[in-house]
Amino acid sequence: MARFNLTQQRCITRSMTYHMTFQKGYTCACCGNVHEELPLRYGSPAPALWFSLAPEERDERCLMNDELCVIDDEHYFVRGCIEIPVIDSEDMFIWNVWVSLSKENFKRTYLYWEEEGREKELEPMFGWLSTSLSCYPETTLHLKTLVHTRPVGVRPYIELEQTDHPLSIEQRTGITRARVIEIAEALCQGS
């Protein structure tokens, strides 16, 4: 695993962290509080497989930083963004998620990670969504994706395969402000 030279990092144990950007506020049905700002970004600190490992094994079996993860030198992940337009707004709702890559595609991603113009060198790569988003009625794990590399400092864009999964439909058609609030309340209840 050391050949990828990733900085090991301990992640928090909650499966979803709330990295937020905001719009006008709302009253939360979960906690009853008035929140001045509407969250438009959520993310997981690690791929789902990482959470299945015993905490005492994570440092030994995983190499991870904020953007890349290798587990047991056989599972390779990159962090990216599923972007969903917010209808009647210029805002984007963003899920920061982890996607698995083949070893070959991970090596190419790693090789170009800090190279200017990397987005021109790397074609879209197949991956499996490796983040569980609990506010969907069907599992989001293992949805088919394409990983689109963007300029250095910008997380890859994650394009879901066009299916009838609710997340895929939302990525194609957008979501309302009411749906953003529904997601915020669902994640509030799950925290």
Question: Where are the regions a protein language model picked out?
Answer:
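Compositionally biased, intrinsically disordered low-complexity regions enriched in proline and serine
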Residues: N5-R10, L111, P137, I158
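Extended interfacial segments that mediate partner engagement and assembly in macromolecular machines
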Residues: A54-S132
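Weak global preference for isoleucine
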Residues: I12, I71, I82-I87, I94, ...
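C-terminal, charged low-complexity interaction regions
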Residues: E114-S191
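Basic, glycine-/proline-tolerant helical and adjacent loop/strand elements
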Residues: F4-I87
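Generic alpha-helix signal with a bias toward terminal, lower-confidence helices
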Residues: C28, P47, S52-E56, S89-E90, ...
